[in-house]
């Protein structure tokens, strides 16, 4: 195990009440849990997301922190947040990267492998490393 390592768990959900399928609007929430499974305290600085719909449209989203925060995680600490995205189709995917800096100055990326956004079956937990 690397001394610089975060584990990422994702739980996507379709939000029917905020969606308008007949107008091509499908809204999803996703809860992300980030756990520092390394041996060094590290801070999440920024994120990059690639959001893809079933028509091949890709939106790249970059920003500082997550939900307005840049959590500092000691070994064993976890941070959980919920955010959302909109698609033009009932299915799509997301994947991304968290850029992190450890307390010793080491910079590292934590990949968030692709997860599925599906208006019919969103809600199954996925553990991603």
Residue ranges and their predicted role:
Residues 86-129:
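Terminal connector regions
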Residues 1-25:
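Low-complexity, acidic Ser/Thr/Pro/Gly-rich terminal tails and inter-domain linkers that flank the onset
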Residues 40-59, 100:
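Short acidic, flexible loop segments centered on an aromatic residue
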Residues 53-56, 68-78, 117-127:
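Short, surface-exposed linear segments at secondary-structure transitions and domain or protein termini
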Residues 59-91:
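Intrinsically disordered, low-complexity Pro/Gly/Ser/Thr-rich segments with frequent PxxP/GP/PP motifs
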Residues 34-38:
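Asparagine-centered strand-capping/turn motif at beta-strand->loop junctions
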């Amino acid at each position: 195990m690397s001394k610089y390592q975060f584990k990422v768990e994702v739980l996507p959900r379709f939000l029917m009440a905020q969606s308008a399928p007949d107008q091509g609007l499908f809204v999803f929430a996703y809860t992300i849990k980030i756990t520092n499974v390394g041996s060094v305290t590290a801070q999440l600085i920024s994120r990059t997301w690639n959001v893809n719909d079933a028509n091949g449209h890709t939106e790249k989203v970059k920003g500082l922190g997550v939900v307005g925060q840049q959590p500092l995680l000691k070994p064993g600490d976890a941070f959980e947040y919920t955010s959302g995205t909109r698609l033009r189709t009932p299915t799509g995917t997301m994947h991304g990267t968290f850029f992190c800096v450890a307390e010793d100055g080491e910079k590292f990326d934590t990949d968030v492998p692709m997860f599925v956004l599906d208006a019919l079956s969103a809600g199954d937990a996925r553990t991603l490393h």
